[in-house]
A protein has these predicted regions:
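Hydrophobic anchor at the beta1->P-loop junction of P-loop NTPases
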Residues: 13
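Hydrophobic positions on the alpha1 helix immediately C-terminal to the Walker A/P-loop
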Residues: 24
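N-terminal phosphate/diphosphate-binding loop that engages ATP/GTP or pyrophosphate donors
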Residues: 27-96
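ATP-dependent NMP and nucleoside kinases share a basic, alpha-helical "lid"
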Residues: 91-163
Length: 219
């Protein structure tokens, strides 16, 4: 259903930074008994590795060369996806200020996207997944019937970011994600919008499940 070779399906959850998509995707996966995959964590992991190697995140050739010499392994622990680079789990570093400031540049490199999209699609060879990101419904799984675009007002997203102790510019991140040439942030064809600005977490998850039911998911 997700790709011609897939044995399982994917629920695509897309949206801008701090829209609530990660929380909704995680709780959806728990409620439905599916594996949750945070595609953004993959890009953050590559960003973390590139910064650790003192590479310029805007030097696409250097970052592409790095990808050829590192081992990225993806899996899952129950309903949670996992990622290691050269055997190291970088989870604790993925939300650092440095990674926040540079992940958009890394994500815009075509070689990075090509490598990680292959890993993302690989999850459906073994599991039904809820995958969240910025191009899941438009690029990674364009044929899935289950697509939600989660959004919220910019000021609310900025407040959420601040409450989480993260320092970056929502406006700058939105501009970078929406204007990049490779897989920009868009509302995928067939996706239903969900505005979480005035919803509780449980309310957002309930709304997402209702959308998926309308899209044909038997949940």
């Amino acid at each position: 259903m997700s790709t011609p070779e897939s044995k399982h399906f994917a629920i695509a959850i897309d949206g801008p930074a701090a829209s609530g998509k990660s929380t909704v995707a995680r709780l959806l996966a728990q409620r439905l008994g599916l594996v949750m995959v945070n595609s953004g964590a993959m890009y953050r992991a590559v960003t973390w590795k590139a910064l650790g190697e003192h590479l310029d995140p805007h030097d696409s050739a250097a970052v592409a060369n790095l990808l050829r010499h590192i081992r990225i392994e993806c899996g899952h622990d129950g309903t949670r996806s996992t990622i290691t680079i050269d055997g190291v789990d970088p989870s604790d570093e993925l939300r650092s200020e440095q990674v926040n400031a540079n992940v958009s540049a890394i994500s815009a490199i075509p070689e990075v996207r090509d490598a990680l999209i292959g890993l993302q699609r690989g999850y459906t060879q073994h599991s039904n997944v809820v995958m969240e990101g910025r191009d899941i419904g438009s690029v990674v799984f364009p044929d899935t019937p289950y697509k939600i675009y989660i959004d919220a007002a910019e000021e609310i997203r900025a407040a959420r970011r601040k409450a989480a102790g993260e320092v970056d510019s929502i406006a700058s991140r939105d501009a970078a994600d929406s204007s990049r040439q490779t897989a920009p942030l868009v509302v995928a064809p067939g996706a239903t919008r969900l505005d979480t600005s005035n919803l509780t977490i449980d309310g957002a998850v309930d709304a997402a499940i209702e959308i998926l039911r309308h899209q044909g998911l038997k949940a």
